[in-house]
Amino acid sequence: IGDISYAVESKAESGGFSVVRELVGHGLGKHLHEAPEVPNFGKKGSGPKMSKGLVICIEPMINLGRKETVQSRDGWTIKTIDGKPSAHFEYAVAVDKGKADVLTTFDFVEEVLNKI
């Protein structure tokens, strides 16, 4: 898992962005949110090993400003502490023998953008 976490963090930071640390991706199974946690930051070779049959949600949250967040009064909305824009996507990935299958597609986003 640490390799994924490291990749998200290093890619974001190489572009001058920051990553949210308080919220993480997760395993997906009988319940929507299960172990293991999949942080957006980490060290290569750390964390749980992935094995065939594991399904995880990688949830990069990339910010133009600082990495710290605050929760709004509505109890749901999360904002960066400096109010700068942030983007969040969720990718569901199934681990198979020697490979990973991305289960999430964003084809609908491309379709909408092509209509503009």
Language-model features: locations:
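Active-site neighborhoods and metal-handling regions in enzymes and metal-associated proteins
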Residues: 1-116
